Amino acid sequence: MKCPFCGFADTRVIDSRLGKEGNNIRRRRECSQCERRFTTFERVEDMLPLIIKKDARRQPFDRKKVIGGIQRACEKRPVSIATIEKIVDTLERQLQESGEREIESKIIGQAVMDALHDLDQVAYVRFASVYRQFKDINEFMAELKDILAEGGNVRDN
C-alpha cells in the first residue's frame, strides 16, 4: 500500500485487529522509506442494489441520505443517533440479503416508516408526511386517526 506521507509503495503491516463491530480489520502500517506509521481499514465491499427513483432514474443506495431523512423526522424526539444507525444497518442488511440488483425507493421508504412506526410515532408521522406527500389535511388526519386507533400516544401541547 502506498504511504500517505511520502508516496513510497512499500509498506508493511505491523499490527492487525478486528474492528469494534467485527465487520472490518484495522491495520497499522509502517512505511519502509520514511518509517512513518498510519492506519488503514479493510472491509467487505457492500453489494447494495441500485435504487429506482419515482422518475425511473437509478442511483446507488446512499446511507447518509437515509440517515439524514430519519434524523429530520426524529428532530427534538428522544431517539439517539445509535438507534437511527441501527435502523439503517438493518435496512442495509435486508437489501444485501435480498440479492436484488435494483429496488424501488418506495420499498426503502416503507421499511423506514415501519421502523419509525414502532419506534416513535411522531417521527413516523413526520417521515410519512414527507414521504407519502399527503395531498391535503384529510389524508394527514386519516393517518393520525390510524395511529390513534392502534393505541398510539399523540399528546396535545
Swiss-Prot record:
UniProt entry tagged with the keyword Nucleotide-binding: yes
UniProt cofactor(s): Zn(2+)
Top-level taxon: Bacteria
Domain ATP-cone, chain residue ranges per copy: 49-139
InterPro entries reported for this sequence: ATP-cone_dom, NrdR-like_N, RNR_NrdR-like
One GO process term, biological-process aspect: negative regulation of DNA-templated transcription
Cofactor descriptive note: Binds 1 zinc ion.
Gene Ontology MF terms: ATP binding; DNA binding; zinc ion binding
Repressor is among the record's keywords: yes
Zinc fingers, unnamed class: 3-34
Keywords: ATP-binding, DNA-binding, Metal-binding, Nucleotide-binding, Repressor, Transcription, Transcription regulation, Zinc, Zinc-finger
Annotated family: Belongs to the NrdR family.
PANTHER family linked: TRANSCRIPTIONAL REPRESSOR NRDR (PTHR30455:SF2)
NCBIfam families, per database record: transcriptional regulator NrdR
Function: Negatively regulates transcription of bacterial ribonucleotide reductase nrd genes and operons by binding to NrdR-boxes.
Name used for this protein in its record: Transcriptional repressor NrdR
